Regions:
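Collagenous Gly-X-Y triple-helix signature in extracellular proteins
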Residues: 228-481
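Solvent-exposed beta-strand/loop surfaces, strongest in extracytoplasmic domains of secreted
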Residues: 1-226
Length: 481
C-alpha cells in the first residue's frame, strides 16, 4: 500500500507500490468504505513470476484508518434554575460518537457524561474507548431580606423577632455587635433578639452558600434597647412611661424614688427660672380600679431630699389676684372640679401636649409632658358645705392636688364619702413626713393645699399645716402647691 487512507464515508482504493498492471492481475478486495483491514491479491501474468520463482497469487493487506476526533467539552455555562438542564458541547457530533453517562441535572454541581466513538472513529490518542467528560451547573446568586430593619425593645417588650427570607437552603446565622445589650438566637428562618441592658446594637444576619445558591451579602437590623435602670433618675421620662404602661414600675423602682425636672415659665404671675426640683413616686398603680391601671403617681416635689411645696410671692396672703389660690373668690362652690386651682393654676382645661399658657403644666419640661397620663380622681365637686355621697364625682386630671384621705388615710374635714373612692398613697402610708418647705426657702415650712373642700363651710378647702396636720383655710388664700 502506497500512503495511508483515512475513513471519509466514501469508498476508497489504495494505490500500490511496485504494481504494474501489465505484469500483475489485481484481485481480492480492492476498495472499501469503512475503516479496517482489507486483502487484495496480486497474480503474475504470462512469463512473470515472483522473486521466489512462484507464479501463484500473493495476498496483500491494506487499511483504511479510523477518522480522528477531539474529545468534547462543555460549551455553554449553566446556572441553577430549579429545572432540569443539559449542556451543549464543543466537538460533539452524534454521527461520530455516542453520548452517555449523566447528560442532564437540576442541582448545582459537577456531573460526568461519557462519549464513545462509533465505528470508523477514534480519539486523537488513538483510543476508541469511552471518555468521561465533566460538566457543571453553577450555583445561582443568593438573596437575603429581613422583614425588619430596626427594633425597639423595652421593659414591656423585651424580645422581638426578625423573619429571614433567603433563596435556597443556606444556613442562617446572626450576630450582635453588643451581646450585653441585645443577644440573638436563630431557629430556622427566625432570629430572636432579646434585650439585656440599655443601649444600642446592630444585628448582622448572614446566609451561607447552600446547595444551589451562593452566599448573599449580609443584612443588618438596628436595635435600640430602653430597658430601665434601677436608678429612677437615670431613665428618660419616655422609658419611665414604657415601664409604667407595662405595669412593671415596682419591679425597678421604689416608692419615694426621685427624678429631677426643671421648671421654667410663668405660672399665673409667678415665674420659675430653671428651678430644679425632684418629682418623687407616691405609689404604683394607685387605686387602679378607680383611677386607672398601669400608672405611676408622682408628687412635686423635693429639693435634694427636702420636701417642698411650690409657693408664689402671694404665699399666705388672702386676695383675688392671680396666685396659687384654690379660687380667686372666697368660695368652694363647684368643689375641686370648678376650682381656679384645677383649671387655671394647674392647667387641666388643656392637655400636656397643648398646655394652657401660664399654667404649671406649661412650665413642666416637654419630655415629661409628652408622656403624662390622665388619672380619674374622685372628689367633692359641689362644695357649699355639702357632705353627701352624690357630690363625690370624677374628674380627669393630668396635674392634681392630693385629697385629705390620700395623704392622711383618715378623714377629718373632707366630705365623708370621698374616702369611699380614694386610697391613701403608699408614700404617706409608710409614715413619711407630710411637712413641706418653701421651694425658695427650703428651711421654712409652709402649708399646702389639698383638693378636698371642707364639708362644714362654703369658703374653705382642706390643707396640710406646717406641722403636717390636717386643717382648712379660705379658698382665696395663696398657699403651697
Amino acid at each position: 500500500q502506497n500512503g495511508t487512507l483515512t475513513y471519509n464515508g466514501q469508498a476508497q482504493s489504495p494505490s500500490w507500490n511496485a504494481y504494474n498492471p501489465d505484469a500483475l492481475t489485481l484481485g481480492g478486495v480492492t476498495s472499501g468504505t469503512n475503516a479496517g483491514t482489507y486483502t487484495a491479491t496480486f497474480t503474475p501474468k504470462g512469463q512473470y513470476k515472483w522473486a521466489d520463482g512462484t507464479q501463484t497469487a500473493k495476498e496483500v493487506t491494506w487499511t483504511i484508518n479510523a477518522a480522528t476526533m477531539t474529545v468534547p467539552t462543555q460549551k455553554n455555562s449553566l446556572t441553577y434554575t430549579g429545572s432540569a438542564q443539559s449542556p451543549t458541547w464543543n466537538n460533539y457530533d452524534s454521527e461520530k460518537m455516542t453520548l452517555g453517562g449523566t447528560t442532564s441535572g437540576t442541582n448545582a454541581g459537577s456531573y460526568n457524561a461519557t462519549f464513545t466513538p462509533k465505528t470508523n472513529y477514534k480519539w486523537a490518542d488513538g483510543s476508541t474507548g469511552a471518555k468521561t467528560v465533566a460538566w457543571s451547573i453553577a450555583k445561582a446568586a443568593g438573596s437575603l431580606s429581613l422583614n425588619k430593619t430596626s427594633i425597639k425593645l423595652t421593659a414591656a417588650k423585651t424580645t422581638d423577632t426578625i423573619t429571614v427570607t433567603r433563596a435556597g437552603d443556606g444556613k442562617i446565622t446572626a450576630t450582635s455587635s453588643a451581646p450585653t445589650v441585645a443577644s440573638v438566637s436563630v431557629s430556622g428562618s427566625v432570629v430572636t433578639v432579646t434585650a439585656k441592658a440599655k443601649g444600642s446594637a446592630t444585628i448582622t444576619v448572614s446566609v451561607a452558600a447552600g446547595t444551589n445558591h451562593t452566599a448573599p451579602s449580609n443584612k443588618t437590623c438596628s436595635v435600640a434597647v430602653t430597658l430601665p435602670t434601677n436608678v429612677l433618675n437615670d431613665n428618660s421620662w419616655a422609658t419611665i412611661r414604657e415601664v409604667s404602661s407595662a405595669g412593671l414600675g415596682a419591679n425597678y423602682w421604689a416608692v419615694g424614688d426621685m427624678k429631677s425636672i426643671i421648671l421654667n415659665g410663668a405660672v399665673v404671675g409667678y415665674t420659675f427660672s430653671n428651678l430644679t426640683v425632684n418629682a418623687f413616686i407616691l405609689g404604683f398603680n394607685h387605686n387602679s380600679a378607680k383611677e386607672g391601671a398601669n400608672k405611676i403617681h408622682f408628687q412635686i416635689g423635693k429639693i435634694g431630699s427636702t420636701a417642698v411645696a411650690l409657693c408664689d410671692s402671694q404665699y399666705n396672703n388672702y386676695g383675688s389676684s392671680a396666685g396659687f389660690r384654690m379660687n380667686t373668690s372666697n368660695t368652694n362652690s363647684g368643689g375641686w372640679n370648678d376650682s381656679y386651682m384645677r383649671k387655671t393654676v394647674l392647667g387641666n382645661t388643656n392637655t400636656p401636649t397643648n398646655p394652657l399658657a401660664n399654667s404649671l403644666m406649661a412650665a413642666l419640661p416637654s419630655d415629661l409632658r409628652a408622656v403624662m397620663q390622665p388619672v380619674t380622681k374622685y372628689t367633692d365637686n359641689t362644695g357649699n358645705s355639702s357632705n353627701s355621697s352624690g357630690n363625690v364625682t370624677a374628674t380627669t386630671d393630668y396635674l392634681f392636688l392630693l385629697a385629705e384621705f390620700e395623704v392622711f388615710g383618715t378623714r377629718s374635714g373632707a366630705n365623708q364619702y370621698e374616702q369611699n373612692s380614694q386610697a391613701q398613697y403608699d408614700y404617706y402610708k409608710a409614715g413619711n413626713s407630710r411637712v413641706a418647705n418653701n421651694h425658695s426657702a427650703v428651711s421654712t415650712a409652709v402649708w399646702w393645699w389639698l383638693r378636698s373642700p371642707y364639708y362644714n363651710g362654703s369658703n374653705y378647702f382642706r390643707f396640710v399645716n406646717t406641722d403636717g396636720s390636717s386643717d382648712y383655710g379660705n379658698a382665696s388664700y395663696s398657699a403651697g402647691v
